[in-house]
Amino acid sequence: MPLPPQATKISRNGVELTSNVDRANYLITELTRAAMRDVAKYVLKIVRANVRGINNYTRRMRYASTRYQYWIRKKECDLQLGIENTAKGAETAWWADQSELGAAGQPKRGFLRSAVYDNIDMIRKIEAQYLSAIEDENNAASLVDESENNPEDEND
């Protein structure tokens, strides 16, 4: 579990300079990632509720709603919402791409797109909650979830 970088102290001729730039950059990136994680959970909750009842196949299929997942990439610092095509011990989600984009005999439903576009105001509120905490360092540190840095916890 990485800790935020400590302040850099430079002493010269009795004058001590303290730089918190690295710590501020760390808090900004981690708050951004925490905001993206909560936005993804909110949007996918709506998507999964919409997918469950579209037809008899998805009602019966246990994995129908869990195929929609999110990925938060560390280096790029962005959020991807999408459909994972395979899972351990399950068949492929051949129907998910067709129901999202449309195909012959399958109407375009656009679960992801409509969930995001219909809830832009709520997404802004969620992100504002995290990004307004930048001003207060103690509040920001409490919002950052250090356990998220484990790679096996990234897919929910």
Where are the regions a protein language model picked out?
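Hydrophobic alpha-helical transmembrane segments of polytopic membrane proteins
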Residues: 91-95
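Short, Lys/Arg-rich flexible segments
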Residues: 1-88, 98-156
